[in-house]
């Protein structure tokens, strides 16, 4: 049976009956970017990967300096168009660049790029394999274009949704990530069997959090929002390293 294991933040390991896909790799930390929760794997302790998908070039979603320690440089990587050069610079050779609604077959797994909106160009993904369909929401805003995902993929088994509602204080509190409540509303549109919140433990550190960033989404608020707007969806809150069959 397919399983998922949270690594940290938006990095998730999806096991489609032995074919493992890693999302948005982030393994190291630096000033202004702290995991805020334990790290379940390092690049060298990961299992053999069938593919890596990466939504955008922000450090906490595309940590190639650290991920370069992963030994299989031929692992297929599916990334937003414009992100491939950096992966090739650190030695990865199997890079495919995509835009929304383009598809890539990686062995028995189908990867479809889907729309997103963030502070930089971004995509989300639908991953299909072993009879399951997974939506990975990276750290997008809740945009109307995501309703098309529900129309094209009417039987989503699992949705991985960001919930911290990140805002940039110096940019007049400009919001760049969906809130827990907006993620609950998106569950109402996508109607997944199971939803798992991601992208909520990150911290920039006490001073930067106070001066630069604002976020307040929690798993509890997400659970409450889903109960109101998508009561048929089961919410599972997972600690890093905790597996879930779906």
PLM regions and their residue ranges:
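Active-site environment of divalent metal-dependent phosphoester hydrolases
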Residues: 29-30, 58-62, 84-86, 102-105, ...
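Divalent metal-coordination and catalytic microenvironments
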Residues: 14, 24, 56, 63, ...
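Zn-dependent metallo-beta-lactamase
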Residues: 1-22, 27-31, 36-37, 213, ...
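Metal-dependent catalytic neighborhoods of phosphoester/phosphodiester hydrolases
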Residues: 63-73, 206-215
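Catalytic core of the metallo-beta-lactamase
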Residues: 7-15, 105-157, 173-182
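Cap/insert and terminal regions of metallo-dependent hydrolase folds
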Residues: 78-85, 144-240
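Metallo-beta-lactamase
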Residues: 79-132, 221-246
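Pre-active-site segment of Zn-dependent metallo-hydrolases
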Residues: 16-57, 61-69, 82, 117, ...
């Amino acid at each position: 049976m397919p399983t998922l294991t949270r690594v940290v933040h938006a990095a998730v390991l999806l096991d489609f009956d032995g074919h493992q896909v890693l999302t948005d790799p982030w393994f190291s930390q630096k000033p202004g970017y702290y995991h805020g929760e334990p790290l379940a794997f390092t690049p060298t302790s990961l299992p053999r990967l069938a593919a890596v998908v990466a939504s955008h070039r922000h450090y906490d979603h595309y940590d190639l300096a650290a991920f370069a320690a992963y030994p299989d440089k031929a692992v297929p990587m599916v990334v937003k168009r414009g992100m491939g050069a950096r992966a090739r610079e650190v030695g990865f050779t199997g890079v495919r660049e995509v835009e929304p609604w383009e598809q890539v077959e990686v062995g028995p797994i189908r990867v479809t790029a889907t729309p997103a909106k963030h502070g930089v160009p971004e995509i989300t993904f639908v991953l299909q394999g072993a009879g399951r369909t997974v939506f990975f929401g990276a750290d997008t805003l809740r945009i109307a274009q995501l309703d098309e995902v529900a129309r094209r993929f009417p039987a989503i088994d699992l949705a991985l949704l960001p919930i911290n509602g990140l805002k940039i204080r110096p940019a007049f509190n400009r919001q760049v990530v969906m809130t827990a409540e907006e993620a609950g509303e998106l569950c109402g549109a996508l109607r997944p069997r199971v939803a798992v919140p991601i992208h909520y433990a990150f911290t920039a550190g006490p001073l930067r959090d106070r001066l630069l960033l604002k976020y307040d989404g929690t798993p509890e608020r997400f659970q409450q929002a889903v109960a109101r707007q998508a009561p048929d969806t089961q919410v599972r809150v997972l600690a890093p390293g905790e597996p879930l069959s779906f």
